[in-house]
A protein has these predicted regions:
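Short beta-strand and strand-turn-strand segments in soluble, beta-rich domains
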Residues: 463-474
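Short beta-strand elements
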Residues: 510-536
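Predominantly soluble domains enriched in secretory-pathway, periplasmic, or organellar proteins
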Residues: 5-6, 14-431, 455, 472-481, ...
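Short beta-strand segments enriched for Tyr within beta-sheet-rich domains
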Residues: 457-463
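Structural beta-strand segments of beta-rich domains
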Residues: 433, 442-448
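Short, surface-exposed ligand- or partner-binding patches at beta-edge/loop junctions that are enriched
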Residues: 493-515
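Bacterial Sec-dependent N-terminal signal peptides
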Residues: 1-9
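Exposed aromatic-hydrophobic patches
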Residues: 447-449, 482-491, 529
Length: 538
C-alpha cells in the first residue's frame, strides 16, 4: 500500500493526430507484409541537388570494425541522470557517468547546476568525444571517452533533444524543440556558435556521410528540413511525411535513405535521399521509437524498436529504397524486457544493442540469428543508445561511478475499471495499461502509460495490496484517443498491482476540457510546453 504519499503527477497526453496531407498515400503493414510503394521518380531538382550538395552521398560509408575491448556502448539514463558505460567485448556495465542528481534529488533546488533528464547521445569517431543532451536542463555535455570526464558544458535552446557531430568532430548540432532552431555547439571549447532557424519543433539532427548536409525532422511539421552545413542555410524541404510528429530518425551508411519515425501513430516514413522524396509509409506499431541502419554479414538492414509491443523489427533494404515487405516481411525480434527504445549496431554489424526503457537494461541481439543473446543491467530509464568503436583503452573504467545501478525498474500487474487485466499484450495495440515502479531517492517513481481507454476521461489509479486494500496513487485524464503516454507519481509503493477506476464525472469533464484546450495547438502551429512534455519519454 502507499505511505508517506508525496508529490504530484505528470501527464503528457498524446497530441492530436492531424492529417497526413499525402498524395497517393502508401501504407505498409510491417507485420503482415503488405506494402504499396510510392513511385520513386526523380524530382525536378534531383540533378540540381547533386550539384548543390557537392556530389553523391554514398562515398563515405564506414568499413566494418570488429568488436573489441576498446569499444564502448553508452546509454542515456533519464531518471538516474547518468550515462551507462558498457564494455561490449564482455557485455558488462563498467559504471556510470553522473551528470546530475537522480530524480527527486537536489534538482528541485534553485542552486542546482547539474543536468536534468539525460536523454540524447552522439559519438565522434574523429575526436573520441561523446555528446550528451539533457532535455529539461537544456544542456549539452561533451565527454572524453578515454577518461569519461566532461570537457565542456553548454547551455543550448529550450527542450534540446537529439543531435550529431559534424564530420570533423569540432561542432555538435542539436535540435531545440521549443525554439524552432538548431543550436551549433563548439564541441572543442564549449559555447554556442550559431542558432539556425529550421521550422516548427525540430527533434533531431543527422548528418550525411560526407558531412555536407544536415537533416532535421520535426514534432509539429510533416517534413524533413535539409540544411547545408557550410552555410547554415536550409536548402530543401522534404514534405509528404506520414505524420507531423516525428521524434527520431536515422540515415543509411551510404547516405541514400532516411527513416523518420512517427511515434504517436506507430508509423515510419521512408525517404529516398537521391530524389528527396517519401517513397513509403510503414505501419510499425505503438510507440515506434528509434530506427537504425546496419550493414551486416547477412546483408543491409534497417532495425526499428517498437516500445508498445516489446519488439525490435528488422527490414531488409532494397535497391529501390522501399522495404520488400511482400516477399520478405519484417522479422520480429522479441526483446527481453519492456519498452525497447534506443538502438545501435556494433562496428561490424554483428550485434545490436537495444535499451529497454521500462526495464533499465540493454538487450544484445545477434544479427545473424535475430535472437537476444544477453541482457545487461544499466542505469535508470535508458533513452538513446550509441555504440562507439575504439572509444577507450581496453579495460579502462576511469572516473566511473555507480549512480543508478542496482536500482532496476519492475513492472507490476494492472487492472482496468471493468476488472480485466490491463497488462495483457495485444499484438497490434500493445498494453492498455502499463505500470512501472523504480526506486528514486528513498521513494518510488510510479510510471503509468495508458492506451485505448475511454477518451477524455479522468481516472483514479490505486495501489492494490495482497490483502485487497487500496490506496490512491494518482489521477490522470486521457486524450481524445483514450491515451495517456506518461503519468508520473512519487511515493512509497508497497502494493502488488495498480488498479483503475473512473473518477467523478464532473471532475472528469472539467479536466478533459482543460486537456483538450492545451492540446488544441496554436494558430501558427508553435510547440507548446504541454506538447514538449509528451516526448520526455521519446
Amino acid at each position: 500500500m502507499l505511505s508517506k504519499q508525496w508529490a504530484g503527477w505528470l501527464l503528457a497526453a498524446s497530441l492530436g493526430l492531424g492529417g497526413f496531407g499525402i498524395a497517393a498515400a502508401s501504407v505498409a503493414d510491417a507485420h503482415s507484409g503488405h506494402v504499396d510503394p510510392r513511385p520513386a521518380a526523380a524530382s525536378p531538382g534531383a540533378a540540381r541537388a547533386a550539384a548543390r550538395y557537392g556530389g553523391g552521398a554514398g562515398r563515405n560509408a564506414p568499413k566494418p570494425i570488429p568488436v573489441s575491448g576498446k569499444d564502448r556502448v553508452y546509454t542515456a539514463d533519464q531518471t538516474s541522470n547518468t550515462v551507462s558505460v558498457i564494455d561490449p567485448s564482455a557485455n558488462r556495465t563498467l559504471g556510470t557517468i553522473a551528470l546530475g542528481d537522480q530524480r527527486l534529488g537536489a534538482g528541485l533546488s534553485p542552486q542546482y547546476t547539474g543536468d536534468v533528464d539525460v536523454h540524447g547521445l552522439a559519438f565522434s569517431p574523429v575526436t573520441k568525444r561523446l555528446a550528451v543532451v539533457s532535455i529539461t536542463s537544456n544542456t549539452v555535455d561533451i565527454v572524453d571517452t578515454a577518461t569519461n570526464k566532461v570537457v565542456n558544458h553548454t547551455d543550448v535552446g529550450r527542450a534540446s533533444h537529439e543531435g550529431s557531430f559534424t564530420a570533423d568532430g569540432k561542432q555538435f548540432w542539436v535540435a531545440d524543440r521549443g525554439r524552432d532552431t538548431v543550436t551549433v555547439v563548439d564541441a572543442v571549447h564549449g559555447g554556442v556558435l550559431a542558432s539556425i532557424p529550421v521550422g516548427a519543433g525540430p527533434s533531431k539532427v543527422v548528418m550525411s556521410p560526407d558531412g555536407k548536409l544536415a537533416y532535421v525532422n520535426h514534432i509539429s511539421l510533416a517534413e524533413v528540413t535539409v540544411v547545408k552545413v557550410a552555410t547554415h542555410r536550409p536548402v530543401d524541404h522534404i514534405t509528404g511525411l506520414g505524420d507531423a510528429f516525428s521524434s527520431d530518425e536515422a540515415i543509411s551508411p551510404d547516405g541514400k535513405e532516411l527513416w523518420a519515425v512517427h511515434k504517436r501513430v506507430g508509423k515510419v516514413s521512408v525517404i529516398d535521399l537521391t530524389h528527396d522524396k517519401v517513397t513509403s509509409v510503414l505501419t510499425t506499431g505503438p510507440d515506434s521509437n528509434h530506427p537504425q541502419f546496419a550493414d551486416t554479414p547477412q546483408g543491409k538492414f534497417v532495425y526499428l524498436t517498437v516500445g508498445g509491443l516489446d519488439e525490435t523489427l528488422s527490414f531488409r533494404r532494397t535497391d529501390s529504397g522501399v522495404p520488400d515487405a511482400t516477399t520478405a516481411p519484417a522479422t520480429v525480434i522479441h526483446d527481453n524486457g519492456h519498452a525497447p527504445h534506443g538502438i545501435w549496431p556494433s562496428g561490424d554489424g554483428s550485434r545490436l544493442y537495444v535499451g529497454l526503457e521500462k526495464s533499465d537494461k540493454v538487450d544484445v541481439i545477434d544479427t545473424a540469428t535475430n535472437k537476444v543473446t544477453g541482457t545487461i543491467p544499466i542505469g535508470q530509464e535508458p533513452q538513446a543508445v550509441v555504440y562507439a568503436p575504439l572509444a577507450a583503452p581496453a579495460g579502462s573504467a576511469a572516473h566511473l561511478g555507480s549512480q543508478g545501478l542496482d536500482e532496476q525498474a519492475r513492472n507490476v500487474p494492472t487492472t482496468l475499471p471493468d476488472g480485466t487485466a490491463g497488462e495483457t499484450l495485444d499484438p497490434v495495440k500493445g498494453r492498455a495499461l502499463e505500470a512501472t515502479v523504480r526506486p528514486v531517492n528513498g521513494l518510488d517513481m510510479i510510471q503509468l502509460q495508458a492506451r485505448g481507454l475511454k477518451p477524455k476521461t479522468t481516472y483514479q489509479a490505486f495501489s492494490a495490496g495482497a490483502d485487497g486494500r487500496k490506496a490512491a496513487v494518482v489521477s490522470f485524464s486521457t486524450d481524445a484517443n483514450g491515451n495517456a503516454p506518461m503519468v508520473l507519481a512519487f511515493s512509497a509503493f508497497d502494493g502488488r498491482s495498480i488498479s483503475l477506476a473512473v473518477k467523478n464525472a464532473g471532475v472528469a469533464k472539467a479536466t478533459s476540457f482543460q486537456l483538450n484546450r492545451m492540446h488544441s495547438g496554436s494558430a501558427n502551429g508553435a510547440v507548446t510546453a504541454t506538447d514538449l512534455l509528451y516526448c520526455d519519454c521519446c
